[in-house]
Amino acid sequence: MARIGVENSLTDVQQALQQQGHEVVTLNSEQDAQGCDCCIVTGQDSNVMGIADASIKGSVITAHGLTTDEICQQVEIRT
């Protein structure tokens, strides 16, 4: 399973991904995104942590406007 970075305010997404067997890392700073296959951010404060510019190998998913299920589907597609 993938290592997924999730902003700390997205607790429902964190729980859903853990139930699917993914390793979930809480994103508190740009360094937390290192080594993640994919990162999920709220999108409310665009690029507040600099993750959009970070050199992570995975993609960044913006959760704004998506349900928890839709976010989980995006993770499955992108990882």
Swiss-Prot record:
Pfam families: UPF0180 (PF03698). It comes from the Bacteria. Belongs to the UPF0180 family. This is UPF0180 protein BCG9842_B3897.
